[in-house]
Every structure is written in structure tokens, then in C-alpha cells.
Amino acid sequence: MKEETISVIIKPLVKSGVYKNEEVALKDIVVNHIESKISNYEKTIKKIENKYNMSFEELTDELKNEAHFEQEEDWMDIKGAIVMKEAWEKARESLIKENNYV
């Protein structure tokens, strides 16, 4: 995305007084998006852990013995959510570290 396109999208937020400047607006929007992604993956993880009343690690051990189709699908969903949550957490950490953003 070109810098001018980003500016066109962000400028109304600055003009309306919601943000001090475009840089602050963009950083806040990106951090909020990352936080939303992390929260959604945490909900997915918690939902599946609650469904089986066990942690991902316990579910993994349980499925080694015998798994049914639905359990395998749930395991793949929770595994994917864990991987993506960790990726978004790394992205957030990198953004904060590289931009001195708190």
C-alpha cells in the first residue's frame, strides 16, 4: 500500500481530533488490530480447552491414544490458534520494540 493511500485513510481521523497525527493514528490502529487478533485466538483456545476440560498439552496426549474426527478437527483448530496467537504476539512485541511504542 502506498504511503499516500495510508495518509488518505488516516487523515480524517487526525482532522476529527481523534488522533494527534497520522503516525500516532497508524500505530494505534495497528496495535489495536494485533490485540484483537490475539484476543480472538485466545478465545478459540479457551473454548476448545473448556469443551474438553483440559489444556492443549493434555488434549494432545489424550488424542495420541485414540482420536475421533471431531477431536482431531478441534486439535487442529487449537494448534492453529496457538501458532497464530504466538505469531501476532511476536509482531506486537517487534512493533513496540522497534518503534518505542507503549
Language-model features, listed with the residues they occupy:
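Charge-rich amphipathic alpha-helical interaction elements
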Residues: F69, M76, G80-V83, A87-S94
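Small, basic N-terminal interaction modules of short regulatory proteins
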Residues: M1-T60, E86, K90-V102
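Broad hydrophobic/π-residue packing in well-ordered secondary structure
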Residues: I48, L59, E72-I78
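Amphipathic alpha-helical coiled-coil segments and their boundaries
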Residues: K20-E23, K27, I34, K64-A67, ...
